[in-house]
């Protein structure tokens, strides 16, 4: 999800020291933009980049500059969000809830998105109709909220 719908289409930064990269000169103080969407959908980096395929991350062995949903590089030396782990954990919890604890239907929706809106997300958001809480979720809810009925 973070590759397909990055939080922002790009990130800005200022060059800290003069350098050359692939024939281009970057002067200290210059504002540069990191194209998150373009890098996360680049066909030289991603096989079938327009395909949503979470399995591509199972055994990730590529560079920390290839997958850049929240900046690139290592946390301690690069420009990667130090809170990225929190985003990943929240998404894991939500995906577990959706996959294991709720019965729902995904409503018809508009999955187009704007490259100027932050955060980047489908035009209609994510719409769903909750049909039922599965027993596992009901038991967990009852344990934490004794005395409250949930139907």
Segments (PLM) and residue ranges:
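Long, compositionally biased intrinsically disordered regions
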Residues: 70-71, 102-117, 121-151
